[in-house]
Amino acid sequence: MEQRHSFPEAAGVTDLRNILPKDQTVWEILRHTDRPIVLYGTGNGGDKLIDALARIGRTPDGVFASDGFVRSRTFHDMPVRSLADTEKQFGRDMIILCAFGSSVPEVMENMRRLDANYSFYMPELPLYSGDLFDYEYFITHIDEISEAYSLFTDERSRALFRDVLLYRLSGKVCY
């Protein structure tokens, strides 16, 4: 549903601070939304997402799993449902947070399908502990980030750096 943003360098803007407006970063969207927030997946990734949401004063409204993983079970006191049942409960205008990663082609295709049909995010999370890569962290470390960016001289490397930065800020899988 959300569209990929392009870095405004082509328009003459070269300051990385302008790569993505604060209100379009994943943690700001989640902090201020009134839409239901649901987790796709359980386990360690789900635990980490719940912890990250708590840092911004939010809790998930529900959780669903792929059809093969839906059993009579709960995750953090929430019933684990199918996507169809979750959609019946919350409607299509929900925010889906992916709580796991995969390199399995069928799973990746399902994630692309979810991204095309819903507000779908896969936020970067601290592996062990530490700060969220949110807008405040980004601005606090902008000098180091800009210095690293300046080390790349070819456009392909710079574009990749921008895409990684856009992913880290937006949580969008299109990057």
Question: Can you say where each PLM-predicted feature lies in the sequence?
Answer:
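Hydrophobic, well-ordered beta-alpha structural blocks that scaffold small-molecule cofactor pockets
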Residues: 1-175
